[in-house]
Amino acid sequence: MTVPPPAELRAEELRVRIGGATLLDAVSLAFAPGRITGLLGPNGAGKTTLLRAVAGLTRPSAGRVVLDGEDLHALTARRRARRVAFMEQQADTRLSLPVRQVIELGRTPYRGRWPVPMDSAADAHERSVFAEAVAAADVGHLLDRAWPTLSGGERQRVQLARALVQEPGVLLLDEPTNHLDLRHQLGFLGAVRGLGVTTVAALHDLELAAAYCDEVAVLLDGRLVAHGPSSDVLTSPTIAHVYGVDVTVERHPRHDRPHIRWNGLLPEGTSP
């Protein structure tokens, strides 16, 4: 799929406080342009909060998000939407729209009206963007289905297509494999990896993160505790500290990435 040049995205001393609670605490993180960074950490670590902040949906209490040298939160919503696509855990499309129109909603920042009749009146570029996104997400057979009839996994893939038609330089994914079976998990992440877009994905599955992410960033209690190549970060001590589990980390015999073998839970309060 043809995509814009990968964007440069970074968080600088990012803090988010909501209702007296600190959800992010001085997080500084540069995301590798054109590569996939996995956001890891237990529930409540701050992964979704960080994604929403770098998407421009949650304004930081301090610090800033920089996109290609500009303060992200100083951009208009339309300009942000042309450069950053955010795929949330659950789509909030309540109307009984056909899948084709759900995907077309992703072109709203460019067309400024809804629904967008790409299949009849749009120019060649619009049709090409739509066709490439549909192919990349493997949803061509779903185009005439109604959104409410889709399974959770089918909705995830339609959401990806809707994000891709935005032609983003940054793709933000919040637990994108949650509702997918194993085959579609691998296919989904493989498709994303082949895009060459600056991608940040919150994931719970450490094996998937090790296999598909170029870098990983680990959060705990709203703080960044590790960031770097998966082979450097996904170590037994780090996993024990963050998740409270005993693991053995080996090299995968086929792709030379970390392979994690689970040994059991660590007693609470145990130091690795």
Which sequence ranges carry the predicted segments?
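The feature captures the beta-strand-to-loop junction immediately N-terminal to the Walker
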Residues: 40-42
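Helix-to-loop junction immediately C-terminal to a conserved catalytic motif
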Residues: 55
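Conserved ABC transporter NBD signature motif
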Residues: 63-71, 80
